[in-house]
UniProtKB/Swiss-Prot annotation:
GO process annotations (BP): D-alanine catabolic process
Family matches, as NCBIfam families: PRK00711.1
Keywords, in A-Z order: FAD, Flavoprotein, Oxidoreductase
Name this polypeptide is given: D-amino acid dehydrogenase
Length: 432
């Protein structure tokens, strides 16, 4: 059975790999010259199931209003006049209740924990190398109020059986020795020992090599124009003016997925959350982080690779704009300089931006659609690297008519209600 996978980020590539392992003939198509050239290229480097949390949370609307007035705010909104932006923000606000937060976080943790286990299994079986570390994640609280507010997340961790450790100020240096000199700036920390780190772009490149060895064909620099449908099935994909056909189709185009789905009458509430990163060469390994540190105040992650520090964060709701805002670089430099002043020189860093495909409830969209042979694997937000292996494996099981190893409740697009309308004559501009 032939499967056409649209998109070669970490999620699309993981989908292709697990589909090939399940015995499918797989072709991957992407507009870029190689895998992981967009959102997966320079993300924060975290594999953090325990910190899988929706942006839509109680108190966020009030915080967002305050953030709009702050120079180093973790969230910024640039109104584009796009109706989809307004609709997405309205849906997000509806998910900012305690009840919705608990449901959404449970779904995200369920998939993220499974995905981490799939990554462990993959690494044990294949020896795939991607500058990975299995040393946990430490969330830093600069105020007692932040430390107290962590109670709701700890409750979810306990219900999900996720190990954690609450650290006082003096204990933080035990897991992150370089923070000893700045411990006076901190009130405490929450450590998740089972979280991991690694270079997502390097992982995706190596996984693509393994997928090729299983027979997967990658076609790069090809322009995906639109999906052709006939009744309740996809008849093919128009790529550079030619109709490509397969038995099954997997859409893994991240933030560009809605553009391909809307003409089919499928409204996928996936909107780009623009993020930024700095990749800083390490100057003193002893003064650099050991794993990943999360600064709760600025929502910035600082991650250790072999000879580099990856500093990632921010969220801009600003459409598909990929311009680099120097103010965001200033924030990232400020945070890493404040916590690790001797770890590396931010002036030598590489500054990057990417678009995270976010849903209003934080949970990705994985599985079937109203079209019998079209499947989705998109909407992972800031957790594409964390969720990639599990999402790919779940998707492969669904296509193979196997029962996935975890519950898929609440993961497919049908949680948003009716999605199929009649759009006979809609032909969008090329999305990917």
């Amino acid at each position: 059975m032939r499967v056409l996978v649209l998109g070669s980020g970490v999620v699309g590539t993981a989908s292709a790999y697990y589909l090939a392992r399940a015995g499918f003939e797989v072709v991957v198509v992407d507009r870029q010259p190689a895998v992981a050239m967009e959102t997966s290229f320079a993300n924060a480097g975290q594999v953090s199931p325990g910190y899988a949390s929706p942006w839509a949370a109680p108190g966020v609307p009030l915080k967002a209003m305050k953030w709009l007035l702050q120079r180093h705010a973790p969230l910024a909104i640039k109104l584009t006049g796009d109706i989809d932006q307004y609709l997405w923000m309205a849906q997000m606000l509806r998910n900012c209740t305690a009840a919705r937060y608990a449901v959404n976080k449970e779904r995200m943790v369920r998939l993220s924990e499974y995905s981490r286990d799939c990554l462990d299994e993959l690494r044990a079986e294949t020896g795939i190398a991607y500058e990975g570390r299995q040393l946990g994640t430490t969330q830093l609280f600069r105020t007692q109020a932040q430390l107290d507010a962590a109670a709701k997340d700890i409750a979810v961790l306990e219900r999900s059986g996720v190990p954690y450790e609450l650290l006082d100020r003096a204990s933080i240096a035990r897991v992150e020795p370089a923070l000893a000199k700045v411990s006076h700036k901190l009130s405490g920390a929450l450590r998740l020992p089972n979280d991991q780190t690694g270079d997502c772009q390097l992982f995706t490149t190596r996984l693509a090599e393994m997928a090729r060895a299983l027979g997967v064909e990658f076609r790069f620099e090809q322009n995906i124009q639109r999906l052709e449908h006939a009744g309740d099935r996809i008849a093919g994909v128009w790529i550079d003016g030619k109709l490509e056909t397969a038995d099954r189709y997997v859409l893994a185009l991240g933030s560009y997925s809605p553009q391909m789905l809307k003409p089919l009458g499928i409204r996928a509430p996936v909107y780009p959350l623009k993020g930024y990163s700095l990749t800083v060469p390490i100057s003193d390994p002893a003064m650099a982080p050991q794993s990943t540190v999360l600064d709760e105040t600025y929502k910035v992650a600082i991650t250790r690779f072999d000879q580099r520090i990856r500093v990632g964060g921010m969220a801009e709701i600003a459409g598909h704009d990929l311009s680099l805002d120097p103010r965001r670089r200033e924030t990232l430099e400020m945070v890493v300089g404040d916590l690790y002043p001797q770890g590396g020189d931010p002036s030598d860093a590489v500054f990057w931006t990417g678009l995270r495909p976010a849903t209003p409830d934080g949970t990705p969209i994985i599985g079937a659609t109203p079209y019998r042979n079209l499947f989705l694997n998109t909407g992972h937000g800031t957790l594409g690297w964390t969720m990639a292996c599990g999402s790919g494996r779940v998707l492969a099981d669904l296509l193979a008519s196997k029962r996935p190893q975890i519950s898929t409740e609440g993961l497919d697009i049908f949680r948003y209600g009716k999605h199929k309308e009649n759009h006979k004559h809609a032909h969008p501009a090329a999305a990917h």
